[in-house]
């Protein structure tokens, strides 16, 4: 009796195995259908190995966006802090980013040289950074613009650029910070001429045509008593985001085995967080203070 049942179970298992193999073969055949050839049209956009991958985002039509949402001129601290919050969110979601730099309506994100994130596909780098940033901009808008409703969603375009060495990466970031200084100095003088001297935008533009850095500083100081060097670092230098170990103090209940009720005590823990700095990137001081950014690549 038992021998018969054992043989019966064995034959059922064998039949089941045959059916499963046939189903698997059918599944493979279905996956490799006649339509699969369309995959040959996909662009192979793998980034070169041993290069820093930089994704730079720029606000699309942000002059209009700033006008529609009543941004302060020449700088709106709310908008700049919102941009930084979005960039911090991107870094926290995509941990292969080692440093980011932002100014005005742009942000650059630097991925590790050794990053194999999404097989180093440029399209993945760009689209995920852009989508995370744009959605964060909408999500956190009310935290910074409490009395200003968002009239329409912002857009950001992106590009991916590869830098083969530490020096070229440092030069790229220096270039963006130099651009921040040039644009902010011009805008500071330009809007002072409009807001305080009553010039029209065209008149202010004509007044500044052909002027050098020293000329703009002289106009600010002699006509408006503004020392450009005293302007906030966030406006003049932009914002640098890096990973740093930060000590966090939290209050939690500590209970001994013999006690019914616990005692609340402050407990300190060290965590790695994204920290915003408004510092100089062009000199060597920053890189000496933060050698960990390039350390793994040396």
Curated annotation (Swiss-Prot):
Binds 2 magnesium ions per subunit. One of its GO terms (biological process) is tRNA processing. It is found in: Cytoplasm; Mitochondrion. Its cofactor is Mg(2+). Its EC number is 2.7.7.79. InterPro entries: Thg1_C_dom, tRNAHis_GuaTrfase_cat, tRNAHis_GuaTrfase_Thg1, tRNAHis_GuaTrfase_Thg1_sf. GO terms for cellular component: mitochondrion; transferase complex. Mg(2+) 1 binds at residues 58-59, 105. GTP binds at residues 58-63, 104-105. It catalyses: a 5'-end ribonucleotide-tRNA(His) + GTP + ATP + H2O = a 5'-end phospho-guanosine-ribonucleotide-tRNA(His) + AMP + 2 diphosphate + H(+). It comes from the Eukaryota. It is an enzyme of class 2 (transferase). Mg(2+) 2 binds at residues 58, 105. One of its GO terms (molecular function) is guanyl-nucleotide exchange factor activity. Its main location: cytoplasm. The keyword Nucleotidyltransferase applies. Keywords: Cytoplasm, GTP-binding, Magnesium, Metal-binding, Mitochondrion, Nucleotide-binding, Nucleotidyltransferase, Transferase, tRNA processing. Adds a GMP to the 5'-end of tRNA(His) after transcription and RNase P cleavage. This step is essential for proper recognition of the tRNA and for the fidelity of protein synthesis. Also functions as a guanyl-nucleotide exchange factor/GEF for the MFN1 and MFN2 mitofusins thereby regulating mitochondrial fusion. By regulating both mitochondrial dynamics and bioenergetic function, it contributes to cell survival following oxidative stress. Homotetramer. Interacts with MFN1 and MFN2; functions as a guanyl-nucleotide exchange factor/GEF for MFN2 and also probably MFN1. Belongs to the tRNA(His) guanylyltransferase family. This is Probable tRNA(His) guanylyltransferase. It comes from Mus musculus.
